[in-house]
Amino acid sequence: MAEAEKLVRTLTGKVVSDKMDKSVVVLIERRVKHPVYGKYVSKSTKIKAHDENNECNQGDTVTIAESRPLSKTKSWTLVKIEERATRI
C-alpha cells in the first residue's frame, strides 16, 4: 500500500511584524456570521511563522503552511510571498 500524500493546511495573511530573527507575525482575517444576529463580523488571528532567510517585510502578503512545532509558539512556515509591500 502506497503512502498517502498528507494534506497541508495553508493560510494567506499580512505580515504585521518582522522584528524577530527568522520569524514573522502574520495577521489572518476571516469573516464569520454572528450566530444570533446573522451579521458578518471580521475576526482576526495573529500567527508566528518561520522565515528562514529573513526575506519578509512588514506589509507583505504571504502564504504560510502548517509544520512541526519549531518553538513554543511557532508551528507555521513561510511558503511564498504573494505580494510585496510598497516602500515609500
UniProtKB/Swiss-Prot annotation:
PROSITE patterns registered for this protein in UniProt: RIBOSOMAL_S17
Gene Ontology cellular-component annotations: cytosolic small ribosomal subunit
Pfam family, one: Ribosomal_S17
InterPro entries named in the record: NA-bd_OB-fold, Ribosomal_uS17, Ribosomal_uS17_bact/chlr, Ribosomal_uS17_CS
Biological process annotations from GO: translation
Coiled-coil positions: none
A molecular function GO annotation: rRNA binding
Keywords: Ribonucleoprotein, Ribosomal protein, RNA-binding, rRNA-binding
Family stated for the protein in its record: Belongs to the universal ribosomal protein uS17 family.
PANTHER family for the chain: 40S RIBOSOMAL PROTEIN S11 FAMILY MEMBER, SMALL RIBOSOMAL SUBUNIT PROTEIN US17M
SUBUNIT field: Part of the 30S ribosomal subunit.
Function field: One of the primary rRNA binding proteins, it binds specifically to the 5'-end of 16S ribosomal RNA.
Protein name: Small ribosomal subunit protein uS17
Protein species of origin: Teredinibacter turnerae (strain ATCC 39867 / T7901)
